[in-house]
Amino acid sequence: MAVSAGTPISLVNAVYGTLVERAALGRKRLGRPLSLTEKILINHLADPANQEMERGRSYADFRPDRVAMQDATAQMALLQFMTAGLPETLVPSTVHCDHLIMAKTGARIDMGVAIDTNKEVYDFLRSVSAKFGIGFWGPGSGIIHQVVLENYAFPGGMMIGTDSHTPNAGGLGMVAIGVGGADAVDVMTGFPFNVRWPKVIGIKLTGSLSGWSSPKDVILEVARVLTVEGGTGAIVEYFGDGADSISATGKATICNMGAEIGATCSVFSYDQHMAKYLQATGRADIAAAADKVASELRPDDGAQYDQLIEIDLNSLKPLINGPHSPDRAHKVGAGVGDAARENSWPLEVSAALIGSCTNSSYEDITRAASVARQAAARGLRAKTELLISPGSEQIRATIERDGLMADLEAIGATVLANACGPCIGQWERHADVTAKPNSIVNSFNRNFPKRNDGSANTLSFVTSPDTVIAIALGGRLDFDPTVDTITAPDGTEVLLSAPVGEVLPANGYDPGVDTFTQPPADGSKITVAVSPTSDRLQLLEPFTAWDGSDYIDLPVLMKAKGKCTTDHISAAGKWLTYRGHLENISGNLFIGAINAFNGATGEGKDITDGGTRLYPEIAKRYSQAGISWCAIGDQNYGEGSSREHAAMEPRFRGGVVIFARSFARIHETNLKKQGLVPLTFSDPATYDLIGEDDRISVMGLPPVPDKPITCRITKADGSTVDFEAKHTFSPEQVEWFKAGSALNIVRQNLAKK
């Protein structure tokens, strides 16, 4: 499979070549107008003539146009792909090195340290990419989603990526879905991508943004309205005159953070902003092709939505969301100030950060730099640590050429590497800062405890780059740039003017250093070596098939209280080192989970001797003793990133069932992919009935689609309580369970060919 540093026009033309006909087929079959979401999905169905298309119920097989993987998740995905026995991927695929670079000093030094520290992993990813026909974007290329937007995304396309913020490509009208590595392996080996047909949430935007309001405030408001669970099982489709007023990169910001409401993905209709962005990034041919089918790259008149929300951009005010949950919204200034005083959050800001895949475009940086120039002209500097992460090498080179980097450095900013950095916990801070409660503001996406720097003392607030730079200058969490002033060195009071940005660089983009490696035409002679003594990479052994028995008297390894995100289940930060080594990464299993029985973090009771140990130690002991176990989650269990390690680790250590009041979509699928059984309490109150010494039995396995499962709690005194649990297994997914994993099914099917 030939893979280059861009999407070939032949692929785009092939997608557009069937779009009109298949959209017409969809209208005929459904008997109504179509949303844009439905048009794209129907055009990518494996069997558009016969596939059931009932929103929220039907499972469907899709043929995505491409796969993208970031370096932290690519390791496990490609270790799985290597076991399939194919000579190359069957769908265009790329690897992007962005997650393993620690932010500490600045771009040049940090990059050098990362290349040295991660040499074994980078060499593995580079060689496995070359062998199997995968495009390789080396360290320094930039954040996967910005690179995809600049080079691969196109209106009406469909892609999957092994990162939860893959929906960023919706800013160019693409259905882009975050998945676990096993889903990526399915597609790379030529099998369809199977997912439940999503509901469609319509968000009508009217008016236009102005002043200090930005695209980030749109998604912060959507998160407030829908909460972190409100988008689960749905694609969010934005439309209206307000949508057409937002730039392509602004649209991408909104789609990107749709992951924080649990949405499958988000998408905007094709418009002239997208066309101009395509032209500016060297893809005028794709814009011209999209223009020819433009009517099918927008929803039909009368398109139906399962839920409709309207937001007036004219009246939208800047927001700041946090701490600990991205839907905890406050108005900038007095709103967050009142909440801070009520909750004893520090008002002094210890750090301000601009970047991440959500907000690191040229437009984002120009708006922040316009505020910085005002400040520098009056002798002002940031009153806190100010860190900037460019989204890509192209962005870095362009903002350096255009003087924007210098504008930011003039007020005290440090420019970090083109990478994720602090957004995913790759940030080495001074211990004296994190030793006490401290507040940080950033333009990132997630603000879970310990997310950015590993410290439970850090309270993280998410907002726009504009507001971040203003708060950095004001020095306080409750600084409101629309009314508050800053005292200049000469004693005068400075009221900052609203930011002004440039959507696209007037002199075009500077591509910077070429960091892409195209795979050779024939990689068959390339050797991919994994040392048996490596502590970072480990070849995988297939999980064992189900033995045909019900699960009886399972001990409860862990019962989580409140949020239990994938960060709680499988922490990032320093643990990113072991993302390619299943045994070593399993040392972080549940270390962030709050024990519902005693409030402790990361530890519980070991049934073998009654002692208290860290969860990963207990899980290892159970595994060595041949004890299968279950875990209990609360609401939206597995919220957050797409990391499949949060499913592979429990499976590796003997976990067989995960119960929860509700699941996040990606994580629920990842659990099924690895042969576990995710079950939702039919009565959420059942969660409260489960005690530390209870044993739980799951009867009537394997799961039967659309039929609940009967379970039993056995108390220490021998008394029992029966309860019902729901599941979402499709017939195909039942086969994953029976085989031991979805990958085992892939191997079996390939062996038959």
Q: What positions do the PLM features span?
A:
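Extended C-terminal subregions enriched in glycine
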Residues: 377-427, 433, 641, 647, ...
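Long, structured ligand/cofactor-binding scaffold of large enzymes
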Residues: 12-14, 19, 23-198, 580-628, ...
